[in-house]
Amino acid sequence: MKTKINLNYIPLAMAAIFALLAFIVPPPAAKFKVDTKASTLTWVGKKITGQHAGAVPISTGELVSDGKLLKEGSFEIDLNALTVTDIADKDGNAKLVGHLKSDDFFGTTKFPKATFVISSVTPKSGNDYTVKGKLTIKGKTNEIEFPATIVHDAKKLTATAKIVVDRTKFDIRYGSKSFFDNLGDKAIYDEFELDLKLVANQQSGI
């Protein structure tokens, strides 16, 4: 006895299969190349008697999205191009820049780059996320966590965040009361602040 197949059901069955696969099969990953001209990273370091501010360029970077959410990525910071923006006097500005590049701070002759590698991105609400990752400065790597706002569309990904970094975890101890006594008003606070704006443009599917 031959079983007759009702051909009218085939389109419905195929539609059901494709609908199921849409839930099972993840969307293709997409790479986003960091736009180093549109991206910015500024810093503020504070001491007992005041503070200083500046900027440091992002030299390269790549992010990976699943089509909706940022999943992984990394970027590199050019410490040799670090600048100070709050000292107008040319000599005073150059003196502070030189000191920050010295071994007392970032030691850029030996360690010209800093890097950040994303470990996880956890949604909170709307465009707000918690980002965890590994920050490497002066050859030392530590995991940091910070809140970020991430706006994602088909062609561009923009992330903004305020990040607090404890410099002593990266062997930058100059002027730290945590390690030196009797510093008085020459003490420099252990934590410095970063204000990040990361802009990346989609390349192609992986």
Set out the residue ranges of the language-model regions.
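Bacterial N-terminal signal peptides
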Residues: 11-22
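Low-complexity, acidic/polar, glycine-enriched regions of mature
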Residues: 23-206
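Bacterial N-terminal signal peptides that target proteins for export
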Residues: 2-13
